[in-house]
Curated annotation (Swiss-Prot):
The organism's place on the tree of life at top rank: Viruses
Name of the protein in question: DNA replication protein
Keyword field: DNA replication
Function: May play a role in viral DNA replication. Found associated with a viral DNA origin of replication and with host membranes, may attach this origin to the bacterial envelope to initiate replication.
Biological process (GO), any one: DNA replication
Length: 392
């Protein structure tokens, strides 16, 4: 039986565990696979130290696997008894706690009727730790068969789909979450907090980068160099708004100079609204001759910076180094100079294709012609316009 204090002290590393979990999701890794790898490593290390322990990668025969599985089942049975005892409040001591399942104990009825939510946080945590101890040996069973997280999910999904005849993706539930974005720029690190609603179970599969106006200006200028941390689901829109306000308030206290939230949160942000007086003052500043001269000079300097020219040159070299890009670019320019330039029977062929696609814009037509005719949307623009005009 694990003693109460031995498990309780583990909570001291909860921040590290939380950060590790966020990092795993942020790196698009599977937490279950990480746990399987950890458990496999632990068993390999144990086998290397104690030769009488099984090595999970050396289970070759059915007999080896039977022995391995039986060991895990024995360990699970032992941990299950500890789990039951922990439900009697381990802070009372193991002997008193066992009254929850020992009917001959005087405290049996009292222990049986005790509500879980009335137990101390430490006792509730102890129960969860005991369940995790069982999970160690369940993981070992998967490791012994060489199964990974993807295979476990697929087989679990197929098994339940067959039994219940339901599809997980058909269950439409909206999730109300809050998040914190940490975005890195050449000017430093900035923070943003917000709220998001989606039907996606795992928010890290959402690819949602936040919605703040300043945040998106940063993305447009410096790219999507950010990390996002999601909260659990709050259950309702109202609760998520409440938590959003608390998050923004906390960020502004902790990072007063680098928190880029404009609004305090709660109902979404429309940005900072100017008064009529502020609008007038801004208009006067923009029309000031000195301001115009300063802006013009700044623009000229920016356009002539060596770094900017080098970057533009690199982009164009990369574009024209690809023969296909060069061909398309030259073809587009020629089409724009000489349009309309389509002749029969090609014109009729494209018209039939355009009609069969439901008379769309240029994009779908370009995709349909790919491989047969290398054209761009710009080259087709005038032709599609002509088709629409003739249909009227």
């Amino acid at each position: 039986m694990a003693h109460f204090n031995e498990c309780a002290h583990l909570i001291e590393g909860v921040d590290k565990a939380q950060n590790e979990y966020w990092d795993i999701l942020g790196d698009e890794k599977d937490p279950l696979q990480v746990m399987l790898d950890m458990q496999r490593f632990l068993q390999i290390r144990l086998a290397n130290v104690r030769e009488y322990c099984y090595h999970p990668d050396k289970l070759e025969t059915a007999g080896d696997v039977v022995s391995w599985m039986r060991e895990q089942k024995d360990c699970i049975d032992d941990e299950f008894r500890e789990l039951l005892t922990s439900l009697g409040e381990m802070s009372r001591g193991e002997k008193e706690a066992s009254a929850v399942w020992k009917k001959w104990k005087a405290r049996y009825i009292e222990a049986q009727e005790k509500r879980i939510d009335e137990m101390s946080p430490e006792d509730q945590l102890e129960i969860k730790f005991e369940l995790v101890d069982i999970f160690h040996f369940v993981l070992n069973m998967f490791v012994g068969l060489g199964m990974n997280a993807e295979e476990i999910f697929k087989l679990y999904y197929l098994k339940n789909k067959h039994i219940l005849n339901v599809k997980i993706m058909d269950i439409k539930q909206k999730f109300y979450r809050t998040y914190i974005v940490k975005v890195r720029t050449p000017k430093g690190v900035f923070w943003y907090a917000g709220k998001h609603e989606s039907f996606i179970v795992n928010p890290y599969n959402d690819k949602y980068p936040g919605s703040g106006k300043i945040l998106w200006n940063i993305y447009r200028k410096y790219g999507f160099n950010y990390k996002i941390r999601w909260s659990k689901c709050h259950g309702s829109r109202e609760k998520s708004y409440e938590v959003e306000r608390e998050l923004i308030s906390a960020l502004k206290r902790k990072h007063p100079d680098t928190c880029i939230n404009i609004s305090p949160g709660g109902q979404g942000g429309e940005g900072r609204k100017w008064t009529e007086q502020q609008r007038l003052e801004h208009k006067l500043r923009l029309n000031n001759p000195e301001t115009k001269t300063r802006m013009k000079n700044s623009q000229r300097i920016a356009q002539n910076r060596a770094e900017r020219k080098a970057r533009q040159s690199e982009v164009m070299k990369k574009f024209y180094s690809n023969g296909g890009n060069k061909k398309i670019s030259e073809g587009t320019s020629r089409a724009q100079r000489k349009a309309p330039h389509w002749h029969e029977p090609l014109k009729s062929e494209i018209h039939e294709l355009w009609v069969s696609l439901g008379k769309p814009a240029t994009g779908p037509v370009v995709k349909a012609l790919k491989g047969k005719y290398d054209v761009t949307s710009s080259a087709l623009k005038n032709l599609i316009y002509l088709f629409r005009k003739e249909d009227v």
